[in-house]
């Protein structure tokens, strides 16, 4: 059975290939339309607002794929600390191994940094919350879980952009040492 690819996904796939080939700054709508095998007018019908709307859709899709992969990678999570270590380890390893992200940071640093900070952070936090918050319901109430996920995502991005001399989030022992006091702040204190 052949999988049916929506026209939108076909355009997003083409956009990804074009970005990988030429980088973001030199890319035109015509390049993407040609790669997707559609007209420029069709691309604008699929993504009213053009390039910006299309790249927003691509970023959201890639974030969803990233967090879906993260969710699928979790194994035997017995505690909030274990969850934090596994999530951070997955995220750091994926970001370090992302050739496209590395290329963007090397050649189009301003664009890449904006997508991880000023412009992109609210989107990253929203998608992280959608995917990760439900996974920690057994450890925290919903309001705490939402705050925890936001702080965890901010920490991981910070450690990726400015690696620490003291902690490596890809190393489970190092990540455990970092996250133990962080997680303790969210755990109920035993009274008595």
Q: Where in this protein do the model-derived segments appear?
A:
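N-terminal intrinsically disordered/low-complexity leader segments
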Residues: 1-6, 186-192
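Generic hydrophobic, amphipathic alpha-helix propensity
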Residues: 7-15, 32, 58-66, 70
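Helix-turn-helix
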Residues: 10, 18-53, 57
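Residue-level preference for short helical/loop micro-motifs built around acidic side chains
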Residues: 25-26, 52-53, 82, 103, ...
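Hydrophobic alpha-helical connector segments
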Residues: 57, 69-97, 149
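Amphipathic alpha-helical packing segments from all-alpha helical-bundle domains
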Residues: 67, 99, 103, 112-150
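Amphipathic C-terminal alpha-helical segment
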Residues: 93-97, 152-169, 182-191
């Amino acid at each position: 059975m052949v999988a049916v690819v929506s026209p939108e996904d076909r355009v997003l796939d083409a956009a990804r290939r074009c970005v990988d080939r030429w980088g973001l700054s030199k890319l035109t709508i015509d390049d993407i339309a040609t790669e997707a095998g559609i007209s420029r007018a069709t691309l604008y019908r699929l993504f009213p607002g053009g390039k910006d709307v299309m790249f927003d859709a691509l970023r959201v899709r890639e974030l969803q794929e990233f967090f879906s992969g993260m969710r699928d990678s979790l194994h035997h999570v017995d505690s909030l600390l274990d969850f934090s270590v596994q999530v951070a380890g997955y995220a750091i390893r994926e970001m370090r191994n992302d050739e496209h992200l590395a290329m963007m940071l090397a050649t189009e640093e301003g664009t890449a940094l904006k997508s991880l900070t000023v412009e992109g952070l609210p989107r990253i936090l929203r998608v992280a919350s959608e995917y990760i918050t439900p996974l920690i319901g057994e450890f925290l109430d919903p309001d705490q879980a939402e705050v925890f996920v936001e702080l965890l995502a901010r920490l991981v991005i910070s450690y990726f952009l400015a690696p620490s001399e003291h902690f490596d989030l890809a190393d489970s022992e190092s990540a455990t040492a970092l996250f133990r006091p962080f997680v303790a702040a969210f755990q109920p204190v035993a009274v008595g």
